């Protein structure tokens, strides 16, 4: 996908395709091409639909990692995924001023520091969250949004676990140079997550899923 155009419109098109295409289709490229065609009028980009569809096939065949060992997006069908989970949840009492003590992002940072092991990629994010730019911010009112997908996968204990998915099309590395695999190495991904505060997004989405 490195040769495809970037930007918000491209990201919205990819999100729409991943939201509506059936990953278990016998001909996945044809399924993805049809989905691109359906959404192209809303999110036009300078890329042929079949080229974008071909780029999205490997996305579906890439292992999901240790939280879903042996699985890819192609393996998880419509019955095991909830797409676009809309939510609205109260934060520390919602809009009832005085009904709950003030809770700030700095308090959330303290939780991260106390609960996450030192080797966890999100552990170091606590310092950024505790800083003057974010730390004093109060959690008050309501949080609304939409989670791109929730996946149900087998749990090693014999049950199921549920994974939060938020699709990203960010281009990492030097935008003036061709992309290389190292631009998306684990350390680079972790740095991008911290820089864009995606760690906080993931944490909030996990709370939403827990309440759901």
Residue ranges and their predicted role:
Residues 1-212:
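Structural signature of nuclease core domains in nucleic-acid processing machines
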